[in-house]
């Protein structure tokens, strides 16, 4: 099985398309396909903050529907799903950019994109365990003792990470560095916490290299075990990145 796992896109369509071309995907029959039958895996948070969330939804929906990609929801995806269901959610932390795009559409197009995203979300797994290659893709990661579970505790961890319930001075949730204590045999590939370079620790790989915050969009290729990145077109915001050499908690 040959896969390309792509980090948090956050509405950065141009960077995503550039990365797909760099990975060797070409547009065929109206969508991206690879001559070597590779498949794409999205680690979640495909929307919010970036300029083209609606177009990214359409692209990911099409790829998944045609069985050319897998999609794993992230915390931003969960919030957008609840918004589309009619629940009251706070339109901030990036959601406001997606809802603004959504409201600019005609009612017909709004209905279309809403139903596409709901279908995409509801048909996707909480996390993806590819047992034949011993790889697990989970948005914010998953510790060894939760692998195989899908209860509320597991869902919270997979979407938000190992949260403490506390916040730092900037309002960001403080998270424990779960990867430092992971000792499982399966490789865990995840995103959620922006880092300047992919972080490899104890069979865990963080590939959220903060494209929407001006750094780069990264893919991890398997079985090659190599990283492929493209530069971001967004403004660089240094304070959005975690330096684990300075602190093991976020």
UniProtKB/Swiss-Prot annotation:
Keywords: GTP-binding, Hydrolase, Nickel, Nucleotide-binding. One of its GO terms (cellular component) is cytoplasm. GO terms for molecular function: bis(5'-nucleosyl)-tetraphosphatase (asymmetrical) activity; GTP binding; nickel cation binding; phosphatase activity. It is an enzyme of class 3 (hydrolase). Its EC number is 3.6.1.17. Its cofactor is Ni(2+). It catalyses: P(1),P(4)-bis(5'-guanosyl) tetraphosphate + H2O = GMP + GTP + 2 H(+). HAMAP family: PrpE (MF_01443). Asymmetrically hydrolyzes Ap4p to yield AMP and ATP. Belongs to the PrpE family. This is Bis(5'-nucleosyl)-tetraphosphatase PrpE [asymmetrical]. It comes from Oceanobacillus iheyensis (strain DSM 14371 / CIP 107618 / JCM 11309 / KCTC 3954 / HTE831). The lineage of its organism: Bacteria, Bacillati, Bacillota, Bacilli, Bacillales.
């Amino acid at each position: 099985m040959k896969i390309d796992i792509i980090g948090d896109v956050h509405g950065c369509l141009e960077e995503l398309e550039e990365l797909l071309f760099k990975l060797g995907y070409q547009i065929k029959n109206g969508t991206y396909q690879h001559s070597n039958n590779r498949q794409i895996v999205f680690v979640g948070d495909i929307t919010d903050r970036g300029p083209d969330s609606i177009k990214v939804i359409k692209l990911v929906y099409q790829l998944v529907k045609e069985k050319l990609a897998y999609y794993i929801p992230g915390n931003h995806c969960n919030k957008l799903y609840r918004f589309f269901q009619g629940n009251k959610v706070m339109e901030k932390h990036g959601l406001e950019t997606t809802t603004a795009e959504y409201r600019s559409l005609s009612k017909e197009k709004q209905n279309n994109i809403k139903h596409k995203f709901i279908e995409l979300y509801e048909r996707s797994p909480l996390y993806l365990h590819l047992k034949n290659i011993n790889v697990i893709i989970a948005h914010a990661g998953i510790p060894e003792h939760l692998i195989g579970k899908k209860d509320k505790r597991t869902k919270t961890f997979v979407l938000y990470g190992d949260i403490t319930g506390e916040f730092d001075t900037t309002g960001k949730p403080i998270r424990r560095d779960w990867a430092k204590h992971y000792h499982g045999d399966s490789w865990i590939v995840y995103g959620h916490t922006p880092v300047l370079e992919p972080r490899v620790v104890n069979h865990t790989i963080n590939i959220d290299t903060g494209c929407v915050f001006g750094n780069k969009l990264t893919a991890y290729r398997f079985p090659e075990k190599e990283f492929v990145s493209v530069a971001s077109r967004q403004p660089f915001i240094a304070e959005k990145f975690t330096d684990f050499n300075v602190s093991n908690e976020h």
